[in-house]
């Protein structure tokens, strides 16, 4: 898996000060995408053990609220194995002390269909994240005042063990 960038002190991609990994690879190609260069799965840098260690080191800082996975799309099919490794590692090390947010262009219903069709890796990812921001960015529905979203069709889902908490 490749990634475009890592931000180690971000406050716009989730609650609190966060470490944000922008992965490469996206099938959605949303009009007006904030990171169009990340559509190409080969863009950027190779994700390595050293990259993971840098993320873990930043999460060990007391100021850091957690990890956000964005992109591109972390749930781009070719990214899922590595993203599963990342969220499993972070959850295993920090439990509920650090939250994990994940942004995807897929909707909750689309993801549930993929799980029903046998995507075990996707189910594992959803079980290990705390917040899912779903839905494609729709330029015509862009709202500057939205918190943690780009367009008003996108939804913020709080999850426990892969299930929505209302």
Q: Where are these predicted regions, by residue range?
A:
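Conserved Radical SAM active-site core
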Residues: 1-3, 17, 35-120
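Fold-independent oxyanion-binding glycine-rich loops
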Residues: 6, 72, 135-136
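Classical nucleotidyltransferase
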Residues: 118-119, 123-166
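N-terminal pre-triad scaffold of radical SAM enzymes
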Residues: 2-29
């Amino acid at each position: 898996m490749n990634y475009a960038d890592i931000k180690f002190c971000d406050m716009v991609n989730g609650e609190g000060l966060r470490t944000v990994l922008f992965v490469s690879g996206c099938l959605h190609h949303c009009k007006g995408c904030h990171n169009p260069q990340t559509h190409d799965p080969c863009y950027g840098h190779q994700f390595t053990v050293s990259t993971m260690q840098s993320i873990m080191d930043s999460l060990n800082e007391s100021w850091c609220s957690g990890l956000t996975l964005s992109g591109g799309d972390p749930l781009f099919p070719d990214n899922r194995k590595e993203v599963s490794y990342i969220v499993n590692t972070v959850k295993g090390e920090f439990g509920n002390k650090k939250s994990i947010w994940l942004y995807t262009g897929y909707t909750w219903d689309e993801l549930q269909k993929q799980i029903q069709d046998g995507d075990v890796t996707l189910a594992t990812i959803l079980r290990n994240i705390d917040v899912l921001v779903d839905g494609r960015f729709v330029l015509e529905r862009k709202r500057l005042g939205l918190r943690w979203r780009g367009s008003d069709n996108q939804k913020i889902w709080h999850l426990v063990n892969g299930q929505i908490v209302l």
